[in-house]
Amino acid sequence: MGFASCQNFQTSEVALTPLAQHPNGMLYVGMETCLECHADLVQSHLLTPHYNTSKQTTLGALENLLANSNTTVKLNDGTSLFIEKEGQQVVQKAFAPTSQEPLYAKTMDIAIGSGKKIGQTFLNWEESSLFQLQASHFNPLNQWINSPGYGSFLAPKRPIFPRCLECHSTYAQAENPSSPMENNRYVQNQIVYGIDCQRCHGPVVEHVNYHRKNPMDSIGKNILKYSQLSREQRLDMCALCHQGTLEQSNQKSFAFQPGDRLNNFRTQINTQASKQVADVHANQVALLRSSACFQQTKTMDCMTCHNPHRAEAGNRVKFNAICASCHQGVTHAPAENATLLKTSFSDCVQCHMPLQDSSMMKLELELDSLFPVQVRTHKIGIYGE
């Protein structure tokens, strides 16, 4: 990690106020600390789906979701869920078929998901316990729906365990870290929302203190650099959350740290997934591993195509250029394929990494009807029409 400039540096060590502390002693600080020397990287990262994968809700953001959308979700048992503003908060209320009084009214305290592709689901605090609410917002249709995985009836509370937050936050402090069994109780003011610098680069306190005292040293010290990691270590960093649920964890959530090997933390890892398994919570890394492009190079990893510091979804020019950097001089015979007759040959991803129906994530967009979410496969290949 290099430094473009350090315009706001401190010339002596200044105590950093930690947001939380990992059981291994690592202190988490705010990303404003990184702004001192990495302003451009931080500002671009703030716009990424990774950083926005969890956040405390604001009234303004929730009001935007209420605008021009049907804020009622009807369930098959006759229960209705209403999402409405109440004072300076937005709440979800559940009503029995003939009742005028809500069965419950719960505040929407935390948003999970960036809302860029699929949408957002919402969590509610009950003292120190965290639960998922039953109504979620589906962004493509600007529609409120029954949350994924819920039956079409008023469901019991769904607790949010650390394994959920492990992939939707940088860190969440358990109320009782020494407990042998993980539960859904947390220290509310010790959650580091979103995926920030520390999740991928490890502890930063020593790094920050060194460079505040040595602002002219342009070589990053006391920080993990991805260039120092092997390809397998780099892949494992992404596979922690992008190799899905076909694994069994044998250590507590948040135990995995950058540079660790995932097989020391997970068992039953499916490294050769079939192309049919394509889900944002499933097998991007395994699908990539099963691709000829990956198998025929010793250097390809997730960051060959993805810059984690930038929001680049839909940037066809960039992704096609990456494909072309290896596949120079490739020609197609459009007369042999009807799909090619309809394309300008400028969208490699659309044909060779097509959207596919997810077998794991389905949404109830209509009463008692499930529709699969489409996810772009990461098994690069030649597909039929």
Feature roles, as predicted:
Residues C34-C37, C164-H168:
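Short HxH-centered metal-ligating active-site micro-motif
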Residues G2-S5:
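C-terminal motif of bacterial Sec signal peptides marking the signal peptidase cleavage site
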Residues L41, I118, F131, P159-R163, ...:
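Generic hydrophobic, aliphatic-rich segments that mediate packing or membrane embedding
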Residues T11-T17, G25, D40-G113, S147-P148, ...:
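Primarily the internal scaffold of c-type cytochrome electron-transfer domains
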Residues F122-E127, L133-I160, E166, T170-S178, ...:
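Propeptide (latency) domains of metzincin metalloproteases
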Residues Q7-F9:
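Bacterial signal peptide processing site
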Residues H22-E36:
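Local sequence-structure signature of Cys/Sec-based thiol-disulfide redox active-site neighborhoods
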Residues Q89-V91, T98-P102, A111-F138:
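N-terminal accessory interaction module
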